[in-house]
Amino acid sequence: MRTNLRRNAIRLVAAASAFGLPLALVPPAQADPGVSAVQSQLVNSVTAPLVKNHLRALQNIANANNGTRAAGTKGHDASAEYVAAKLRKAGWRVTLQPFEFGYFTENSAATLAQISPDPKTYTPTEPGSSTLGDFSTMTYSASGDVTGTVQAVDLTLPPTPAPSSTSGCEASDFAGFTRGNVALVQRGTCDFEVKARNALAAGASAVIIFNEGQPGRTNTVLGRLAGPGVTIPVLGASFAVGEDLASPAGTVVHIKTDTTSENRLTHNVIADSRWGDPNKVVMIGAHLDSVVDGPGINDNGSGSAADLTVAEALGRIPTTNRLRFAWWSAEELGLLGSQYYVDNLPADQRSKVKLYLNFDMVASPNYALKIYDGDDSDQTGSPAGPAGSAEIEKLFEKYFDTLRQPHNGTDFDGRSDYGPFIEVGIPSGGLFTGAEGIKTAEEAALFGGVAGQPYDGCYHQACDTVANISDKALALNTGAIATAAVVYGFSRNLPGSGAPAAAAPQKKTLASVAADGRVSG
């Protein structure tokens, strides 16, 4: 039986053709002697056309569901069912892990207008637009249609040189607040949720949170609350709008928001192989959800489809270690699916997860080949990952070096699903080809493409379709995923085995996002 299954392994990873997937022959540490022979013959089962077929299927699902595959929508449910069905057919044990989360969408653009003393209409940040208006609707704001008098709450005008405003951070800031008024609150030293909750408790009919005013803190606030539950409209605004509304006293405004903010059920898709040591789990993941505003084919259909293609090829191959693939939900709302998984994994099971590999946005059209900086050799941002992360980084470096492909590092900045694993000391790594960041001239010289332009100009937009994919980046990175899966699936000494965990970099969850409005890839 094992011999027959080993023959099936010959069909795993592609030859290097125009859209085939190169497999760099990186031998597993102390692997089964037969593995190198298996690796050298792994052809036909993992090809870029197969990955593209999955991407087209995800696009079709989005097309049939209002252009989105966001967590909590029928588009995501159908995506999860599609992945699960493919995995079961390939021989995996599949679990749909349910969890509840806060769903939010802005159904139409909001209104903010000054009625008196000087009539004026402010420009909204349109739903799904990357162009900032004068104000925005905060994620998890309630719907509402309010006309009321603006009442300033403990503002610091002019602002201090360094951020210091505590406006709205204490219930006592609202002493003397007139019920039904619109609370005008300044960004500062506490979470937006705290400000909004205090305003709600004081009887405010709506809240406007404007930027604090220091250099770098003047643009429109793009913020989020911790979840559904604040039952009044909550807007973020620029410092200029805040100054405008703060004086004179008695200014009257009209606010209208049209949102859906509620708790919904979604699922992670978890697939375990039937082979390998259950005490040595090699975990590979990608988030499956898109943003509400688009189909999410690069972000992150690319990582999801690449992982799925590799998993299909590996399903009936008896590996030395247990392989576990995961497709996370609600990553776009703050890594919620992966965080739920890690938080609810019993300690004895968590200790069996020996490493985690994350693949988020692996086919950006203006790509750079980025490897997560496990050893902090780039000396930027967050510190090194847990012990073993450096070895993972070196494996991917060797893969690209073998193919004579340039590569560079990318920081563990907490924007994707490795965050919860790093936080608990699990060695982590992965690949990334860039999001809304701007490609440098040095990167353009290495990878081609256009310097001065985003890696993905359709990031978090409706144009993130199957046309928004680099076939070359998709092929190279899928080959890297397949290589890592085989290497770690058969390795007898996994990265970081027996070593103490390094200090974990700070992950970006809703608590930290509240201060700057940033979430994830």
Q: What name fits each language-model region?
A:
Residues 37-46, 64-75, 184-190, 195-196, ...:
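Second-shell loop/turn segments in exported
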Residues 137-168, 224-297, 309-312, 316, ...:
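Soluble metallo-hydrolase cores and metallopeptidase-like ectodomains found primarily
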Residues 31, 37, 44, 56, ...:
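Noncatalytic luminal/extracellular "stalk/propeptide" segments of secretory-pathway proteins
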Residues 438-506:
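His/Asp/Glu-rich mid-to-C-terminal helical/loop segments that flank catalytic regions of hydrolases
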